[in-house]
Curated annotation (Swiss-Prot):
UniProt GO molecular function: double-stranded RNA binding
Keywords: Repeat, RNA-binding
Organism expressing this protein natively: Oryza sativa subsp. japonica
SUPFAM superfamilies: dsRNA-binding domain-like
GO cellular component, one term: cytoplasm
Polar residues biased stretches: 216-225, 249-263, 473-484
Name under which the protein is recorded: Double-stranded RNA-binding protein 6
Domain of life of the native organism: Eukaryota
Keyword set includes Cell inner membrane: no
């Protein structure tokens, strides 16, 4: 409960959250805890030891809340809150409107190093310039300038109230009192300049006020080290006062401090650690940074380093000794490591042997080749072929007056073969006991060549009708026609079987009757 209230107060006051520290005592089976809380730079401890850490922290928070409640309203805390929220800029703008002066103008100057800049801002209000504390950024520098201007105007109000015997009214707003004091200040300046033109005008610049530092004791330590206050004493009662002569000498030579034989004069605290800040003996923001030593790694393919100077033999003085010889580094040998997935070595072209080629085509062909003419045969026995296609029979014709071709053969002559017997074969005659098939008689084939072939083929003599024998090779026929031809041959063999003489006479008589 108390921890939540203290945290809420810190958030409303724009402070950092309270930080708790714990002290543990006793054995492990029965520990004791004592807590302390840091609120806005102040330390509050619990009154005693507790069995749990939670109880100790709540007790420390309760002590902090009780101490803050007894103090009453804190003007320093209120000023800190206004400074964080930036209300002083609005207050200065309101005062400028009441006085009838232009709005305040801010001028910021940057100084310091590139990575650590320092901004200093000045604000001009009613012809008067106010300078604020330096800050790390421009926005905070403007807030500091507005706060310095407001504190300076409040000092002006107090000076005017002390000079005059008029009672100060607490009910009046502070902005109105500051505006009245600023108007009186400008009126007095005009009257003084009117009476004496050669008189010096009133000061137009108000630097930052020292009371602002006393009002915020923690702000001075925020920009410095947090360890330094722990080593320094809390009171200056043990420190030895310095004489004005020594202070003058120190001001003349700030970079050469004299060392005292007594170590306690340098460290006033008896039990303090010997802490001497280095920054006190050099100019701030203007000194050169110490050199940086970078340790370099030795490369892989480099010569071995030289031995240390202690390991070397004692050398003679430089005047008596010879100049050191020049040492050459050992040569570096790099062994190429081929990658794993490299292609195989490319083989060179194999030697070619010259070969002499004799052309055979130039020799004259001795044997004459007769032209092959495609012949189409129409078979009259349609029943035996049973729907099969008519075979195309290649016919070889020997020309009597053929001359040996020189380079190419004679063109092929298409020949159409017509069957002489166009009548279909009659059905077998049933005589006597059974059906006797007729013997298969192959008619002569008449070959007739077309007219174009007659004109083209001059060597052919005689009539255009040529008697040729159509021989069909079983390899040139398809399977279906081959089966049909085999069946016809089987029937022909059956027809040539020996029969009786009586049956033959009956067949002849029957044929004569028809």
């Amino acid at each position: 409960m108390y921890k939540n209230q203290l945290q809420e107060l810190a958030q409303r006051s724009c402070f950092n959250l309270p930080a708790y520290t714990c002290l543990r005592e006793g054995p492990d089976h029965a520990p004791r805890f004592k807590a302390a809380v840091n609120f806005n730079g102040e330390q509050f401890e619990s009154p005693g030891f507790f069995t749990t850490l939670r109880q100790a922290e709540h007790a420390a928070a309760e002590v902090a809340l009780a101490a803050l409640a007894r103090r009453g309203p804190s003007y320093s805390l209120a000023a800190r809150i206004l400074d964080e929220t930036g209300v002083y800029k609005n207050l200065l703008q309101e005062v400028a409107q009441r006085v009838g002066a232009p709005l305040p103008s801010y001028t910021t100057e940057r100084s310091g190093l590139g990575h650590l800049p320092v901004f200093t801002c000045t604000v001009e209000l009613a012809g008067i310039t106010f300078t604020g504390d330096p800050a790390k950024n421009k926005k905070q520098a403007e807030k500091n300038a507005a706060s310095a201007a407001w504190s300076s105007l409040r000092q002006l109000v107090r000076q005017e109230a002390s000079s005059s015997n008029e009672p100060e009214s607490n009910d009046e707003q502070e902005q109105i009192r500051i505006a009245r004091a600023l108007l009186n200040y400008r009126l007095k300046e005009k009257m003084a300049m009117a009476n004496n033109p050669h008189a010096s005008p009133f000061p137009k610049k108000f630097p930052m006020q020292p009371e602002r530092r006393t009002a915020f004791p923690q702000s001075s330590h925020s920009s410095y080290s947090k360890i330094l206050p722990l080593f320094r004493p809390k009171s200056n009662s043990r420190s030895r006062p310095e004489s004005p002569a020594a202070s003058d000498a120190a001001s003349q030579t700030p970079f050469r401090p004299t060392e005292s034989p007594n170590p306690r004069s340098r460290f006033p605290a008896a039990e303090a650690a010997p802490y001497v800040p280095v920054g006190h003996f050099r100019m701030p923001c203007h000194s050169m940074a110490p050199p940086v030593t970078v340790r370099t790694s030795i490369p892989v393919f480099s010569a071995p380093p030289l031995p240390p100077p202690g390991a070397r033999t004692q050398q003679l003085p430089p005047l008596m000794s010879h100049p050191p010889p020049i040492r050459m580094a050992s040569p570096v040998r790099i062994r190429p490591a081929p990658p794993l997935f490299t292609p195989s070595a490319v083989q060179g072209p194999k030697p070619m042997m010259p070969v002499q080629i004799k052309d055979v085509q130039h020799q004259q062909i001795k044997e004459t080749r007769s032209p092959v003419m495609p012949v189409q045969v129409k078979d009259a026995q349609n029943q035996l072929l049973k729907g099969s296609l008519s075979p195309v029979i290649p016919v070889q014709i020997k020309d009597v007056q053929s001359q040996p071709p020189k380079e190419a053969l004679s063109p092929a002559i298409p020949v159409q073969i017509k069957d002489v017997q166009l009548q279909p074969r009659n059905e077998p005659v049933s005589i006597g006991k059974g059906v006797v098939p007729l013997p298969a008689i192959r008619p002569p084939v008449k070959v007739e060549a077309p007219a174009e072939v007659k004109e083209a083929s001059q060597p052919v003599a005689g009539s255009s009708v040529v008697q040729c024998k159509a021989d069909t090779s079983p390899d040139s026929l398809p399977k279906t026609q081959l089966k049909t031809a085999n069946a016809d041959n089987a029937d022909a063999k059956d027809d040539h079987l020996p029969v009786d003489a009586e049956e033959v006479e009956d067949i002849i008589r029957h044929l004569e009757l028809k």
